[in-house]
Amino acid sequence: MTAITDLGLAGLRDGFRAGDFSAREIADAFNGAVAGAKALNAFIIETPDHATAAAEAADRARAAGELLPLSGVPLGIKDLFCTAGHQTTAASHMLGGFTPTYESTVTGKLFAAGAGMLGKLNLDQFAMGSSNETSAYGNVVSPWRRNDGGNAPLAPGGSSGGSSSAIAARIVPAATGTDTGGSIRQPAAFTGIAGIKPTYGRCSRFGIVAFASSLDQAGAMAQDVRDSAILLEAMSGFDPKDSTSLDVAVPKWEANLSSDLKGKKVGIPKEYRVDNMPAEIDALWRQGIEWLRDAGAEIVDVSLPHTRYALPTYYIIAPAEASSNLARYDGVRYGLRDLPEGANLQEMYAATRAAGFGPEVKRRILIGTYVLSAGYYDAYYTKAQKVRALIARDFEEAFRQVDVLLTPTAPSAAFALGEKSADPLEMYLNDVFTVPASLAGVPAMSVPAGLDGQGLPLGLQIIGRPLDEQGVLNAGLAIEQRAGFTAKPQNWWAK
């Protein structure tokens, strides 16, 4: 019999509805798994009482015949989402002790759908990072290990590294993530799970701690494509409290899942064939093309000519918006306050921000402040916005020819913790395949598709038209079914 904690979101939901187990049994199993996996450092806080209370409510609802869409399912919540009555830190000392009095729209929707919360998941500080090494609460460790006998702890990706590590380790069935330049998709690829960033505006940003407001988007992370569709459906919807929220109906993504791609065209962007791409990544990409052809799709070569400018464009726009968003953290209203004896207001601001922000956050604030300064605004920020428009236009042109695009998700498998942290530019290059879709605001998903020579997961990315999450999910399902990815990390972390 399959252990409860090995079941994904759909398996738990359907098994609970069929009476195979109670919601309380589900909650107890996952609460125990979370408590026994401290070595992963995936959680900043654990909330077993929340998961248990939601489970007991689900059991009562089942007895009364009043089940909700996610009744019986406990989730992990990235600690970037405000949760009423539960600490929200964005993995930064700057928000130490901050307990929101309100609920983010996304978590409010999930809890209203019957889900419980197992805890708040670790992340890169203020979602800035690609390895989950910038958290003030310590590195998250991937549950995966190389098969060459080396025991170097591996990065789970970032910024949603707590989410990816916890799902891959089967200590949560699914989790929320956020994606600004790849923070759902790259961790998903590193840990052998599925993750989808929907169209910008599909999920409300209200109550999500802001990094770069024109790029930030909540999304779903789970074991597979179906689970991702279920979770994203529950998270999505118009919210008048978010001025960028899209007032469009939420489709029935799970009900309309289909791996039959007959009549669909899949684009292969030539600019993604970058120099020094590892042979294993290139081979998997070629295999993915054959899988989609086998599913009935026509393969078409396309061009996204401004792709090579995407990374520098992103690392101008995102820090610029971050420097503005993070100006609010000054020690006056909430969070950390560092008040040296005899200090005036300006000195308190300086001391608080110096103590509260980590090195990577400070680096991005400085970059952002520089490109927004009077002498450089037009040379950097204005020019980057123009290039962003060109990148979006490239996608528009491509989607006149094809329905979805297929690319690698990341330029490598997971790297060791500490391997790239000394060189910020090398770390930023991890986003090379994910950033373009973020700049264009289009939906994109990573699906686990194979293992490298050291036994580590590799992902393929599907990018779709605006609001065509269904097309992305369906292409992802076609790859998932043909890849047959069932690999799991060997359990070394449980007590």
Swiss-Prot record:
Cellular component, GO annotation: glutamyl-tRNA(Gln) amidotransferase complex
Gene3D superfamilies associated with the record: Amidase signature (AS) domain
Main EC class the enzyme belongs to: ligase
InterPro entries recorded: Amidase, Amidase_CS, Amidase_dom, AS_sf, GatA
Record: active site: K78 (charge relay system), S159 (charge relay system), S183 (acyl-ester intermediate)
Pfam families, per database record: Amidase
Family: Belongs to the amidase family. GatA subfamily.
Name of the protein this chain belongs to: Glutamyl-tRNA(Gln) amidotransferase subunit A
Lineage: Bacteria, Pseudomonadati, Pseudomonadota, Alphaproteobacteria, Sphingomonadales
